[in-house]
Design a protein with these regions (language model features):
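Conserved catalytic motifs of ABC-family nucleotide-binding domains
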Residues: 179
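Helix-to-loop junction immediately C-terminal to a conserved catalytic motif
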Residues: 52
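Conserved structural motif at the start of ABC-family nucleotide-binding domains
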Residues: 6-8, 21
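Conserved ABC ATPase "signature" region
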Residues: 119-154, 202-206
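Catalytic Walker B motif of ABC-type/P-loop ATPase nucleotide-binding domains
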Residues: 183-187
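ABC ATPase NBD coupling module
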Residues: 56, 69-93, 129-136
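The feature captures the beta-strand-to-loop junction immediately N-terminal to the Walker
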Residues: 37-39
Length: 215
């Protein structure tokens, strides 16, 4: 097997008698943007759902090649793929928590790390220094990304009150809080005006070049 960041081999997804993905193979490299192009209903979102554990493919394999190990994504559930393989995603329709603040949305992405630091115990949350330290670190990381997209001054506002383009960017940087090796974006520019699309392109170039994340 070669050492691409992502290797997909003969991926097939069937729903009863309907074949949504038929024997798809491709690879994606670190520090590059790889696009899956096709008309509505071609199965693009289904590919992402397989990669991120929402669906278990009928056939085929998906490998995430990290520097120290190769991970077979098919073996893991969705949250384990995010936690262990460091694969993150956004959705075709924005999936923020609109009634929570912008900052709270960023902290939700770091829930797994905070729970590990707590020892999965209410006593850990209340008393453990490591939990408090991790919480401070999580807020710092969240504010770093909010500064990148120019939303520091909106940190306490409800995410649902942001303009559409800012919500798109917020969803992307929320995903970046897990420090992913691979970031899957499902039609990230859908509904954006030219100015918002330009800002999105700059953000993705920064993620690709500065964070060395495959997109």
């Amino acid at each position: 097997m070669n050492k691409n960041l992502l290797t997909v081999e003969n991926l097939t997804m069937k729903f009863g008698g309907l074949t949504a993905i038929d024997n798809l193979s491709f690879s994606a490299n670190k520090n590059e943007i790889t696009s899956i192009i096709g008309p509505n209903g071609a199965g693009k979102t289904t590919v992402f759902n397989c990669l991120t554990g929402f669906y278990k493919p009928t056939y085929g394999e998906m490998f995430l090649n990290k520097s120290d190990e190769t991970i077979a994504l098919k073996k893991f559930t969705d949250f384990k793929i995010a936690q262990k393989a460091k694969v993150a995603r956004t959705f075709q329709n924005i999936r923020l928590f609109p009634a929570m603040s912008v900052l709270e949305n960023m902290l939700v992405a770091q829930h797994n790390e905070l729970m590990i630091a707590s020892g999965y115990s209410i006593f850990g949350i209340l008393n453990l220094k490591r939990y408090k330290d991790k919480e401070i670190e999580a807020v710092k990381k969240a504010k770093y990304w909010l500064d990148i997209i120019g939303l520091t001054n909106r940190a306490d506002d409800n995410a649902g009150d942001l303009p559409y383009g800012d919500q798109r960017k917020l969803e992307i940087v929320r995903a970046m809080c897990i420090e992913p090796k691979l970031l899957c974006l499902d039609e990230p520019a859908a509904g954006l005006n030219p100015k918002e699309s330009s800002e999105l392109n700059k953000l993705l170039e920064f993620i690709k070049n500065d964070k060395k994340t495959g997109i």
